Amino acid sequence: MRINPTTSGSGVSTLEKKNPGRVVQIIGPVLDVAFPPGKMPNIYNALVVQGRDSVGQPINVACEVQQLLGNNRVRAVAMSATDGLTRGMAVIDTGAPISVPVGGATLGRIFNVLGEPVDNLGPVDTSTTSPIHRSAPAFIQLDTKLSIFETGIKVVDLLAPYRRGGKIGLFGGAGVGKTVLIMELINNIAKAHGGVSVFGGVGERTREGNDLYMEMKESGVINKENIAESKVALVYGQMNEPPGARMRVGLTALTMAEYFRDVNEQDVLLFIDNIFRFVQAGSEVSALLGRMPSAVGYQPTLSTEMGSLQERITSTKDGSITSIQAVYVPADDLTDPAPATTFAHLDATTVLSRGLAAKGIYPAVDPLDSTSTMLQPRIVGEEHYETAQRVKQTLQRYKELQDIIAILGLDELSEEDRLLVARARKIERFLSQPFFVAEVFTGSPGKYVGLAETIRGFQLILSGELDGLPEQAFYLVGTIDEATAKAMNLEMESNLKK
C-alpha cells in the first residue's frame, strides 16, 4: 500500500504524524482506535498500526475506518492478521483511503489487497497510484450503445454472447475447464482487442491461485522472459486472509482495471473468482461491526455493497470493463440472497457442463443452459438470432431423443429424427474448439473464429449441405472449412488403409 498516494514511495508525511491515535480495543480483525478531539479520520481512511510484538518483531498492520463511534473513537477493519497487537499501540491516520499501484507496470505481477507485490520479483516500477474507493462513472460518461464483445470462442459468441462492458456469471464445478476458459479469454482479448486483463482472486484456495499463476506462465499469458509483455495483472486475497482483505480485494482489482479503461482507453477483462466470497467476507465484517443480520444471516447492506462494486464495472466513452465472475451457489440454492443479488447484475451466464467435459468436448460450455440478454434480433441481427435458435432447437430435440436412443437404439427412430440426431452430433462437436493456451496439452494449434465465420459454419450444418461428412471431422476444429478439409483427410486415410 502506498501510505501517501501523492508521493512515489511508501511513507507518512509530517502532517500525518501530528494525528496519532491509540488502539483501545481489539476484537479479532476489528480494532477500536481513539484519536485526539477534533482530529477524527474520515470513513474509509487507511490507518497503520505500528509497534513491536511480545518477541520484539516489528508490526505494521493496515486497517480501514468503517465507523465513527463517538467519544473520539473509530472502528476499523484490519487488512492483515492482528496477531501480536495490544491495546495502547500507536496508530497513524494516513489521511487517505488505501491506494494501489496502477498502469502497465502491474502486468505480470501478483498483488495483495494493499497493492503490495507478493511474487518476490521486487518493487513495482511505477509511481502512479489510485484509491480503491471511487464513485461509479456518471451517466453522461456511459456508453449506452449495446454491442457484442467478440471472444473468438464459437459456443460463446453464437449462443450466449457477451456484452461489451457487461457482466457474465461463470458457473462450473471443479475440473470442467473454468481456468482454461479464463486463460483463453485473457489471451484472445490481448490479441484481438489489444486489451488487458485483471484477475481478482477473492477468498478462494491459495493452491488454486498458485496453479493459475503457474499455468499462465506455461501458456505465455504471463511472459517469464519479459514481464512487461504480460497480458494480465493478478490480485489475490485468498481464504486464509482476514475478512477485511477478502472484502476489499475485489475493489483493488477493479481499481487497476479502471485505470486501463479510463487513462489507457483500453478494453479490459476483469475476472472475479469468486463473487460469493466477496459477499461472505462482507457478512463476517458486518457481524464484527455489530450490525443486525438480515435474511439468512447476511449483512443488511448486501445490496449496497454489491452495487458499489458492480456499478463501477461498465462501458464509458473511453473504454470498457467486461467482467467475468465465477459464482458459487451455496447448497445449489439459487434463491440464496448472495447469488440472487448477483444475478440482478448479470447480462449473461456461461454454464460449464460436466457431461460435455466427460465426452471430451472442450470448451465444455452447456449450449442449452447458458443464457445472454444480448441474444435478441434487434441487437445481434436476424441472421445470428435465427441460427442460434435453430442450433438450440436441434440440440434440445436431440436431448429429448437420447432416452429413446439409449433403450431402443438409433434404428427405431424415424428417418427425420435420425437426420436431426446426425446434425445435432455434428453441431455438438463443432461447438468444440482448440485453444491457444491448451496447445501445450493438446498439440493442436489454437483457433480464433470470428462471429461471421461461426454463423456461416452452423448455417451450413443446419442446411444439410454437410450431411455426408463424418461427425469426427467437426471435432476440435476452428472454421467450417477446416472441418471439410479434415473430412477429406480422414477419407484419404481410410482409402490408404484399404
Swiss-Prot record:
Compartments in which it is found: Plastid, Chloroplast thylakoid membrane
Entry function: Produces ATP from ADP in the presence of a proton gradient across the membrane. The catalytic sites are hosted primarily by the beta subunits.
Top EC group: translocase
Family membership: Belongs to the ATPase alpha/beta chains family.
Key words, A-Z: ATP synthesis, ATP-binding, CF(1), Chloroplast, Hydrogen ion transport, Ion transport, Membrane, Nucleotide-binding, Plastid, Thylakoid, Translocase, Transport
Residue positions binding ATP: 172-179
GO cellular component, one term: proton-transporting ATP synthase complex
Subunit structure of this chain's protein: F-type ATPases have 2 components, CF(1) - the catalytic core - and CF(0) - the membrane proton channel. CF(1) has five subunits: alpha(3), beta(3), gamma(1), delta(1), epsilon(1). CF(0) has four main subunits: a(1), b(1), b'(1) and c(9-12).
Database matches in SMART domains: AAA
Entry's EC annotation: 7.1.2.2
Gene Ontology biological process terms, A to Z: proton motive force-driven mitochondrial ATP synthesis
Superkingdom field: Eukaryota
Pfam annotation, one family: ATP-synt_ab
Reaction(s) catalysed by this chain's protein: ATP + H2O + 4 H(+)(in) = ADP + phosphate + 5 H(+)(out)
Stated name of the protein: ATP synthase subunit beta, chloroplastic
Biological classification of the source: Eukaryota, Viridiplantae, Streptophyta, Embryophyta, Tracheophyta
